[in-house]
């Protein structure tokens, strides 16, 4: 009951009880309204829990991972082969023996983790729902055992994050097997106009990184783009995302970021109308 009353207060709904007294009953200052998707993802990663990000194409799943670890090792499972993901064995004619060759991505992750042992490094399995079933099975073993090909352990400071498009958003998407699905904590990305507008004016160097190192300064979304999306919102029209009809390109958060880059590169904000 006390928890319910506290939640009602923090959402500014009227209660007959004295607000100040109820706030004193919340000594830990819980504020449920300020927990973002990024907070949840970050908490899972720091807790060494493998995370699966769901969402529509262009919703910024990859961008959220890169916010936390700009140097994350991205593995596009759509294009992965068993050899590229799991390594391979080659014959050595000199010794007459088979030699195990580690996959390139694994070598890179090991080097990053060794060079920066106090930093968490993310192994990002992108487009996992578009991967071949055989590749998904290998990814499952990596997530389950924390090792590649049953031979090479992931470093202690490596974490796994995966992402995939919804089945109704990609014709080539495959349903994950139940064991693989259940190995992840699942976060469903929902990019709203309000959350995007907040992100759009946040300088990228202000992101709360996992490593807290100084990053190259990146530009915020171009003011012309921001103003247009905001104006359309007040006109009760969602211009951030439009449905794809199979003929013309649709709008989504990723395409607005592309348009922003064009306006910055050309220095011609009047191009906004043509881009729209």
What are these regions (language model features)?
Residues 3-276:
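C-terminal regulatory/interaction module of P-loop NTP-utilizing enzymes
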